[in-house]
From Swiss-Prot:
GO terms for biological process: deoxyribonucleoside triphosphate catabolic process; nucleotide metabolic process. This is Inosine triphosphate pyrophosphatase. Its EC number is 3.6.1.66. Its cofactor is Mg(2+); Mn(2+). It comes from Pyricularia oryzae (strain 70-15 / ATCC MYA-4617 / FGSC 8958). Pfam families: Ham1p_like. PANTHER family: INOSINE TRIPHOSPHATE PYROPHOSPHATASE, INOSINE TRIPHOSPHATE PYROPHOSPHATASE/HAM1 PROTEIN.
Length: 189
């Protein structure tokens, strides 16, 4: 009789139900995703600096293993802005305002960047997993329910117009989680 190894469980620190649903859709059933909301103050810095700080503080608060995520939307014409501050830009100016930022520029290209940080617990060196998807910024199309999905176009469709499974295969988040899955699989072998 062969027994399989117990399924790996991660404690994903988020209060965003859309992010949680995407992470669960990509990782489960291979990796069980539990969720916990913590109020973590985000430092200002690069995406990597923000993620490292967040994962270290989350591991200390939870006193155990955690997974955190930070996302950027980088406009090439604006040398990477809004970058890691996209959440605050979205809350302040919305889809139309983000499009207006690029109104004076011919270049509408952008990068969607997702960085997950995993820590085995307090004092453990965090590991980062990053995914990038190239696209462009367009006027909003599709349901406006998940951040900037309605204005980020990849190969003719905005994220918001895509089927969820299709989006998860090509998205910045999906690419980062693929790296996380590979890392966990390598550690089991």
């Amino acid at each position: 009789m062969t027994t399989s190894a117990p399924r790996k469980t991660v404690n994903f620190i988020t209060g965003n139900q859309n992010k949680l649903a995407e992470v669960q859709a990509i990782l489960e059933p291979t990796i069980e995703v539990q969720s916990q909301k913590l109020d973590l103050i985000e430092v200002q810095g690069t995406l990597e600096e923000v993620t490292l700080d967040k994962v270290r503080r989350a591991a200390e608060q939870v006193e155990g293993p955690v997974l955190v995520e930070d996302t950027c939307l980088c406009f090439n014409a604006l040398k990477g802005l809004p970058g890691p501050y996209i959440k605050w830009f979205m809350e302040s100016i919305g889809h139309d305002g983000l499009n207006n930022l690029l109104a004076a520029y011919e270049d509408k290209s952008a990068q969607a960047v997702c960085t997950f940080g995993y820590s085995a617990g307090p004092g453990s060196e965090p590991i980062l997993f990053q995914g990038i998807t190239e696209g462009k910024i367009v006027p909003p199309r599709g349901p406006p329910f998940f951040g900037w999905d309605a204005i980020f176009e990849y190969e003719g469709q905005t994220y918001a117009e895509m089927d969820k499974a299709e989006k998860n295969k090509i998205s910045h988040r999906g690419k980062a989680l693929e790296k996380l899955q590979a890392w966990f699989a390598q550690r089991e072998n």
